[in-house]
Amino acid sequence: GGSLLTLPFALRHPRDKAGVKWAVIAGVVLALHFVGFFLAMRMTTVAAGTALVALQPIFAALFVKLSGGHIPSKAWLGMIVSFVGVGLVAGVDLQISTDKFLGDLAAIISAALAAVYMIAGSKAQRTLETTTYTTICYFICSMTALPMALIAGYEIFSFSAKEWWILLGLILGAQLLGHSMFNSALKRVSPAVVSLIVFF
């Protein structure tokens, strides 16, 4: 839905091959992140799953550092404090059952994928405008997630009128105003710093 709304703006800007490649990678990784997140929500507690997915900034900082980037010392301190809090929340579930442990693991993998998505988005927007990037990324994400949903047997079209309005609200609010603003920030700020917003 979001890709269709941003398409008219994206068509106005040139498309660089390297940027498109990173946008496609970001779209695939974003879809896998969502799959991992919702899988985690089914297998572990919402509190633990959400907290573990919030490890995204730490993964982003590690990936940026490994690629030669710079992370401010204050950012590291903030992430360490957050990591301790996440550990206190997740540590309870690790001892309960195999399912919840696997759910926690899925959440951690989802966090790492979210970090990769942010870094890929940052690389894509070195040569692409944000509207072009989000159009490609959101479209690839939906096309990657669609067959997974169909194979899993989920109903993806038979919604009530109220549910369609809710979906429209999510597209306009959460996706275009929220998610796309994150992506726009990646043109100017390090992925690790942008990722810190998930803690607020």
Task: Name each model feature, range by range.
Residues 1-3, 29-30, 38-70, 110, ...:
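Specific alpha-helical transmembrane segments that line the substrate/conduction pathway
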Residues 5-6, 24, 30, 55, ...:
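Hydrophobic transmembrane alpha-helices of multi-pass small-molecule transport proteins
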Residues 22-27, 38, 50, 79, ...:
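Residue-level signature of transmembrane alpha-helical cores of multipass secondary-active transporters
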